[in-house]
Structures are given as structure tokens and as C-alpha cells.
Amino acid sequence: MNNPFDKLSEISVDKPKTVIAIAIIGIFALSSFAQYIVFDNSEDAFWPENDTTSLLYEVEDTYNVDLDLVRSIVKFDGDLEEESTWIMLANVESQMLGYEELVPFHYGLFGGSPNSGPASSVMFWQQIQDPGSDTWSSGVEAALMNVVMSDDENLSSAVGTAMAAITSIPSVDYPDSTVLNQWSETSSVRGTPSEWQARMDSGDNNADTINNLIGMVSGLTDGRAIEQNMTIAPLQGQLMGALSPLNALQNLDMKSSMMSMFPTESRDDPWTLANMALITVAIDTKPSLHEVELETEVSVLVSDMSVDLETSLINSVNIEYSENDELTVFSFSRFAEEQAGNVGAEIGMLTSASVVILGIILWRQFRSVRDTSIVIFLTLLAIGATYGVSGVLKLEFNAAMNSIPILLLAIGVDYGLHVVLRYREELVNMDSEGKETMADFSKEARIKALKTGTMLTSAALVVAIFTDMVGFLSFRLSSQNFLVVFGTVIAVGLFFIYLLSITALPALLTVLKPQKIPVAKSVKVEKSKFSTWSGEQALNPMTVVVAALLLSLPVGAGITQLEIGFDFRDQLDEDIPVVANFLILSDEFSGQNQPPLYVVLNVEVFSEEGKDAYLNSMSVLDADPSITDQTGVWEVLELESSRDSDLREILDSLDTANPEWLSLQDWADANQDLTFRYLRGDFKQTVISFQAPTLDWQKTVDFVTELDNSLNEEGEASISGRGLILAQVSEDVAKSAVASTGIVAGIILIMLLGINISREKTPQRGILKGFVMWLPLSIVVIWVYGLMGWFGYQLNSQTVTIGALTLGLGVDYAVHFVTRLDEEIEHDPNAGIVNWISITNATTGRAMMAAAFTTAGGFAVLNLSSLLPLRLFGQVFVIAILLALVSSIILLPCLMSIFGLIPKEESSV
């Protein structure tokens, strides 16, 4: 079968300058399209297309707004029973609220206020619920008694005095920066921390006092004349407007909401155990508000604001820190920018290290800095072209693509190594008598050797490459988008590497002057003890085959020990401060670095049935101690009713015989700016958002399964959320590993069968030969997965592809070996099986070993990565390379001997 690319190799040697110009100009032009690659380092890039994902996107599109949470993580020396700690926390929150760069973007996420912190929570509790801080009710009560006791003559005066007393009634507005600055001034009313903490722990509130005042207000007109009632009516209206909101807030559990600001393990006794606190300011991240066009631009701006805020807080003269206090500022924008920047820098560092290591290994083979540089340069060009095609196709890159440059570099260098070594081998075998260096050969001899060596290498490469390409393109059948992109990019990259190896590489070797490399060091083709031993094994092949099968049993059993390691934290470098903060929020604060999970209720929201379904779901969430910050539309309505007396009346009617559901719907329709985060516009769907730890995928799957069962015992509800989907992706990793390996194995088998049927004399022999070439590859995959299991390696975003990559690399080795073995049999039919295999291993086998060590060296640099998935991938792939090499040069010839694919005659010599 003729190789359609042989013509390109001939042209490259005959017209090298033209080919070089076309290759370099074309690839640089193509590489420019790399700017259109879509980079997505978020979790979304790994997500499958399923009902849970669709539901989440529906929820986020319907209810979410563009915002970020700027959070100060304050580590304090001492505990919360010290007044100095609270003064520091109050000052930090006040400074955050007043920070000029953030003020224009404040978003009223927390009941209409942008801030949430321990100090403001205490001051709000003191303001609306704390009996010990009640300095106003006695004065209001006295003023009301004065109105009750007044007669017509002094009624107006008494009403005026009572009107003035209304100003002493606390407002229900959440503390702002000005109020927070008054922490020390209000401490005399509040008392020492131990005093007010005891009152907060008791759960006492002002409900009885306020209800008593409301009763007095309602009775002011009893027994009065109409004229007197007209005088009293304005007082009644203003008092009810001030007291009703306060009364509505008496049942709020202020302490529980504040506990989410302290580490989870300290919540049983936060006042003595807590050593950290969260202070949060919500900001709007709509691009238009920041006067930019793209969300990515906003992310950079918010990240910079977070860094500047941290510096400002640490250096503020208005905040008195103790010696061991620490403060850092976290925002999701800062996390995204610094993590992405670190990954990009690390990939650049690893790629550079890989180039250095590969250069050293290649130089040891070539003994030529020039030839080493050419091979590496062309491989880098091929990688650039690959990224250019990826940009044209607008492929979406994510964290799973981090290993692609190193993978292509290591494999691409192998192809160049095969071409250069085969060229030198052909040149030496042609006529080396009297030649001491490579420069001593004539130009004609070099050109002939280049053509022959390139085309012979290409004959093996073209089979291996297109088998690999079809195999990796079969990833497009996967439901995992990142596997689809990974397979496509690898297939494109392999093609460009092959193309440059058989065109630009021989063209450059033709143009450049030959170097004075000693012939003895340029290439080794003599038999070694190992090559002779490998040939002798084919005389008694069953020994090797049985040993391989016996080895496969215990090693393969390790597959049962394989675990999934697709946790998002593995994609993170904990040495980056903002990443460390991200993990603190997850580990110490019940996953508050995570987007919320959602309970979705499809029901007529404003109806008896809808409210019951909501309350039942809320009771299930409240019963789980790991769940925090559960909130929804009814919490919003209750909070807003403290400010809106009309809404309060509507809500109060819901428990009567004449509930005003339609009025409530009208109110919600008129106030969508308050309810849109939890209520769909048609009032037939509502969501409850809540926080729960979701970094551990298995615990998340189990947790959500149990929660889903509990919710559906009380009615029909669905659960979605980013943490849940990531857990499902983790669960699918094992399936993807099996599916991708199985698909690639099947495709490679079909390709090998088809190629060998077209090359062999009979279809039967072609089928047998294709199967025998494939069999060692499948055994190697079993070995690789088995060793991963025994050594404790996990399947993650990188190693999930190891089975398919092992097959792809293994088929390269198998095709190289069999192609060269066929050449040796054809060249000297009487040499015998030992000589055929020995010479094959002494020549192509030696090049395969060099290529394997080169590839292994390239992947070894991944052990320098700070990211666990990349380190594991590098280690596992080195194992896979060595096993694939061993199977090709030892096991494969023995199998071919057993199945009669190698003539049995021995040489008479």
C-alpha cells in the first residue's frame, strides 16, 4: 500500500527551501488564530449535558444576579469574650463598608443591606431584640399612659409628647458604617461581652414589651369622643408604623444567622472557641455598572479592588490589631484571576523545563545541538499550529488541557527522533567504509538516505498516526465535553507533528551543512545482548506469554482498588494565599466559598399548597446541621413586612379564614426587585437557596441523595447546584475512563485490522495480524489501571484519559516494530527469527527505547507541578510508556511467533 505522504517527503528533499518557507509562514499564520481559543477554568467546562445541569442553568438564568462577595477573613488572637476583639471586628466592617472603590457597587443582598458581619449582627440584635438594651420602651409607655389619662383640655399636649417619644423607637434598618463606628459608645448600654452574650444565648427578646405597647396604642381611642379620636389617630398610625416592623422581627433567630460567620466547629460555644470571623460586603458585577463590556474585565477590576481593600484594612490607623491578628480579603474574582494566572505561569514553567530535559536526552542520542534544536523547534511549531486550529474551531480549554503542550512536545520529539536516527542508519548502511564523520558522506548519498529514511519511517508513522487520530477523535462520542475537546486537540496535534516530521525536518537536514559527528557516535545499529536475548525468546514464546498472563492476574486485580479523585480542590494550588482562603471558607465555614445549592419547587407559590410545600422543604433543610443560610421568598416577605405595613396585613391574613393570596401575588408583582431571586415571574416556581460543603464529591452525592429522598417524602422537589453537578461529574469519571478506553481500543482494533488486511496477502492473515498487534496494547491497559489501583493513584481530570493515551502510544510502538520486522524479513528471508527480531530491536527497537525515555523525561517534569492531577498524570504516564515499550519489543514478537506471523525457519549460518 503506497503512502500518500511519500510525495511530500520527496518534494521536501528536492525543494527544501520552498518547503521550509511554506511551513514556517503557514504555521505562524495559523498559530495567530490561537487568540480565539476559549479558556474556561471554571467548573462549567467539565459539566455534562443532563437534567441537573439544565435545571441549574434555568435557576441561574431566572433568579441570579451578577454579584461577588468581598469577604474579610479575620483571624484574631484571644476570643469573642474580649471587648477589644469586637471593637476590631466593628472597625473592619465599618472600613469595608466605607471603602470608596466599593461603595458605588454595593448590592443589598442581606435584607437590603450590602454588609454582613458579627459586629453589625450584634448591633442589629441589640437594636431590635435585646431586652438589656431597651432604653426606649419605658418612655414610650409613659407617654402613652399620659395620653390615656389626659382629658380634652391637655390631650393635644399629651399627644405631642407621645409623638416626640416615637423618635426613640429603634428603626429596623441594618447598621451601616456610621452605626458601626459607634460600637464603643453603645457598649455602656449593651454591657460587657459576657453579659450581652448570655442574653443572646437565652433567646429573650422584646416581643412581650412591644405587644403590650401595641395593645396600648390600639386602646387609645376606646371611650373617646370623635373629636378626640381625630387628634389621637395620627399618633396611632405613626406608632403602629414604628412598632409593627419591630414586632415582626422578634422571632428572627439572630444568633443562628450570625453563627455562619464563625468556624463550624466553634458554633456550639462560639464565644470561647471561635478564632476566625467572616465579614462580607456584596457588590454588583454587571459589566455596564463598571463601564466595561465583558464579565472577564469586571473580574480583573474586582480582583484589584479586593487586593487594594486588603492593603487598606491592614494598614488602617483606625483598626487596632493585636500582635497575632491576621486579615485577608477574599473574593471570587480575586480567586479566579490569581488561580488562573498561577496555572498559566506554571504551564509555561513546566513546558520550559520539558524543553530543557528533552533537549538533554535528544543531545545524548544525536550528539548534535543543531539537530536537537531543529526537532524541538519543529515540535513547538506543530503545537502552535494545533492551538491555531483550536482557535479556528473555537474549542473551549479547561484545566484538563494543562498537560497538552507537554504531551505533544514529548510525543512530537519522538517522531523527529525516529526520522533523524533512521536517516543516519540508512546513511551508515549505504557506504560507511572510510568515512569517519557524517560530513564525509557525499551530498547525493545524504539526499538518498534522507528520502529512504524519511519514507521508511513515514510508512510506520502514517499507520500509527492515523490510528491514533481516529482513536482520539472517537472521544467526540463522549458525553463529557472536556474529553471531546481533549481528544480533538491531541488528534490535530499529532497530525501536525507527523506532517512537519516528514516534510520540514528532512528539508532542514537537506539545506544545512553536514556536521562532523563521528560515525560511530551518530547511530548504533549493532546487536546488543538484549536484542539477541529478545530474539531468542521468540523460539520459546509460550514462556513469555504465560508469564505476561500470570502477571496480569494480580496486577489487573488492582483495578478494583481504583478510586475517583475528581475533587475541585485538586485543581488548586494551596500555596497561593487566595486559594488557601478559598479552602478555609470550605473547610472552616461550611462551604461558604461555594455557590449555593437549590431546592426547586414547581407549585402555585401563593396558595395553601404552595406554602405548605415550601415550609415542609424548609423544615427538612433546618433539620440538617451541615446546612446553613437557607432562605427563600417567604423569608424575604417576612423581612420586608417589617418595613411595609400593607404587606404585614396581607401575610397576617393568610392564617385566617379569608387569606389574601391574590393581594400577595399583586404585591410580589409590584415588587419584583425584592422577590426575583427566589420567585419566578409567573408565580409557579420558587427556589430555596442554601449552603452545604460540596468539595468532597462522594459525600456530596450521598448527602444530596438523602436530602432528595427526605424532600420528596414531603412533596415533589428537585435539587440542583454547582457543587452537585461537580459531584456528578466526579461520579461519571469512572464511566468516562471505561468508555473512552473502550472506544479508543475498539477504533484502534478496527484500524489495525483494516490496515493489515490491505497490506497482507490474505484477509485472514491481515485480521490475525491486526488482532495480535492489538492484544499487547489491551494487556498494557490492564497493567496500567491495575498498578494505579495498587499504588493508590486516582482517576481525575487528567488520568481519566490514561487508558486511551496508553493505547495511542502503544500502537505507535507496535506499528514501528512490526513495520521494521517486516522490512527485515523481506530484506533477508533466510536470516531466521532470532536475527530478524534481534536486528529489529537493535535498530528500530533502540530508537523506540530512546523515544520512550525521551517521552518519559518530558512527562517527568509534571512532577514539578503544584497541581495534584498533573503530578499524578505525569507519574502514571511514565509507567504507561515503559509498559507499552516492553510489550512491543518483548511480548509482541512472541505473540506473532505463536500465531505463525513470523516464518519459523532458522538460519543455517
Each language-model region and where it sits:
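Feature of extramembrane
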Residues: 1-354, 359-370, 515-742, 763, ...
